[in-house]
């Protein structure tokens, strides 16, 4: 896939889906442009995870059209899609006792035949990503013994060795302390590929992501440049909270403080 800001990774038109008798997404129309870091935000139940599950083929029965690299998403095989798109889910069981190296190497599977062995090129790619994610010293450790932050980096590393054009992540900072949240966000946005990350934290969204998509009750409330969207009116309308927003000269980003409506 050509990675330029002038082309769309995803072209979404009139996307809707009903699950368990409830309409979750309602008429989503949106282009996700290559070369940008997008953050998908919205309250619980607004449809964030559902939208990501559609973009990653985990949900296939939907209305409307989704084009990926100009081709109907439904026409991709799982393997073909995984050769250019990687997904970091909200929950990863990690129940098998792989070493970190073995676990990350699983990300090379979309580029192999069923019985192909790991190649020198596979080893080079995995070793490079282990270095990049600060996991090289842990490559012989069991994945089951890692801390939350280490395991999240391993999950990201497994996605990165796919060498994707597009990386999709569902709340990757959940259960991480502040230090590991910042490290992980820096890793995500430094990849120089298209990323779409669902988050709850608007401060992280404003600090790391240039593009914002806001969902409210299954519809797009706003999308565009993050700095143009995050404001007290949006926060009050979408989250039912009052807020104060200040520009932080040290970070070059805004800081958001929240207040309950009834407390003001």
Label for each model-derived stretch:
Residues 64-72, 81:
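Conserved ABC transporter NBD signature motif
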Residues 10-12, 25-27:
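Conserved structural motif at the start of ABC-family nucleotide-binding domains
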Residues 238-264:
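ABC ATPase nucleotide-binding domains
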Residues 41-43:
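The feature captures the beta-strand-to-loop junction immediately N-terminal to the Walker
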Residues 116-117, 142-146, 150:
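Conserved ABC ATPase signature
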Residues 167-171:
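Catalytic Walker B motif of ABC-type/P-loop ATPase nucleotide-binding domains
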């Amino acid at each position: 896939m050509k990675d330029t800001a002038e082309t769309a990774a995803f072209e979404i038109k009139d996307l809707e889906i009903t699950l368990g008798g409830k309409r979750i997404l309602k008429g989503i129309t949106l282009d996700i442009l290559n070369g940008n870091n997008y953050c998908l935000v919205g309250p619980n139940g607004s449809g964030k995870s559902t939208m990501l599950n559609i973009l990653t083929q985990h949900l296939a029965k939907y209305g409307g059209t989704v084009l990926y690299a100009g081709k109907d998403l439904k026409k991709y095989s799982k393997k073909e899609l995984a050769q250019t798109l990687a997904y970091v889910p909200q929950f990863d069981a990690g129940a098998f006792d792989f070493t970190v190296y073995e676990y990350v190497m699983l990300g090379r599977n979309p580029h192999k035949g069923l019985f192909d062995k790991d190649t020198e090129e596979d080893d080079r790619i995995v070793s490079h990503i282990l270095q990049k994610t600060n996991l090289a010293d842990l490559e012989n450790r069991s994945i089951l013994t890692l801390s939350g932050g280490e395991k999240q980096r391993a999950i990201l590393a497994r996605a990165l060795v796919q060498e994707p054009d597009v990386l999709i992540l569902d709340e990757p900072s959940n259960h991480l302390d502040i230090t590991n949240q910042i490290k992980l966000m820096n890793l995500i946005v430094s990849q120089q590929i298209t990323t779409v990350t669902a988050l709850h934290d608007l401060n992280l969204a404003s600090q790391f992501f240039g593009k914002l998509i806001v969902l409210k009750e299954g519809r797009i409330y706003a999308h565009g440049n993050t700095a143009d969207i995050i404001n007290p009116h949006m926060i009050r309308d979408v989250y039912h909270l009052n807020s104060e927003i200040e520009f932080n000269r040290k970070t070059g980003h805004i800081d958001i403080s929240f207040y309950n409506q009834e407390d003001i």
